[in-house]
Curated annotation (Swiss-Prot):
This is Elongation factor Ts. It comes from Rhizobium johnstonii (strain DSM 114642 / LMG 32736 / 3841). The gene is tsf. It comes from the Bacteria. Residues 80-83 are annotated as: Involved in Mg(2+) ion dislocation from EF-Tu. HAMAP family: EF_Ts (MF_00050). It holds the Pfam family EF_TS. Its main location: cytoplasm. The lineage of its organism: Bacteria, Pseudomonadati, Pseudomonadota, Alphaproteobacteria, Hyphomicrobiales. Keywords: Cytoplasm, Elongation factor, Protein biosynthesis.
Amino acid sequence: MSEITAAMVKELREKTGAGMMDCKKALAETAGDMEAAIDWLRAKGIAKADKKSGRTAAEGLIGVSSQGTKAVVVEVNSETDFVARNDAFQELVRGIAKVAVSTDGTVDAVAAATYPASGKSVSDTIKDAIATIGENMNLRRSVALSVEDGVVATYIHNAVSDGLGKLGVLVALKSTGDKEALNAIGRQVAMHIAATAPLAIRPEEVDAAVAERERNVFIEQSRASGKPDNIIEKMVDGRMRKFFEEVALLSQAFVINPDLTVAAAIKEAEKAVGAPIEVAGMARLLLGEGVEKEETDFAAEVAAAVKG
């Protein structure tokens, strides 16, 4: 069995919110497999699927920019929030987002593109900014969406400046209808995506591995009821239907009008748009998502628990 380290216990606790001893036991029961340990805790009712660590190392900004029927969202990290509030840094992120629209939107393509204000690549411009501002920074993520007919609506939650904030969303809507009305529903859907973080647009598009993992957790939880297998199967099927409704955009209750699903709200909007609307893509970037910062005092606490 793999050695259970303090760092592993710390990571599991941050991901699940479970107690240190529960995390240590979960890792021991699963031979140190982090994902399996998360599922073990969930099956025992100790952790929830959507528990996220609030400890993120990355500061910086999310930037959005659009041009015609294309838009991009980028994440540029800095070490401190102080730098993120710096006018020069904000202008840099805004400029990178504008450059990104003319590329295919991948990080490599954006990094290699020319930054007009410096005449250098975006990558080299960031290096110059590091020397000037005195803090490490990097282009971490970039996503572009485009449609032939329609709009790509953008949304920045709690914007700190024009097109800049901590959470950015794109949603691509295919339609030959009125662009102004299309942008209006697009912005509302983008706001909804910011609030709910759907995993996919449609239930059938949810990653099969994610769905299978949920089903296995539900099976273990249902077995604890002691009911026959045929009843357990029905219970699991019902919970899976609810799971898909909760994580797929179009089947979610629309945050702006919970009486409607997102699909129904879009259908309603077709009256004003004057043509059918199809959700062709979406992207949601939350600053620092998936990056953890060092918590030295807490690490010492975990180390004591592991030794115990």
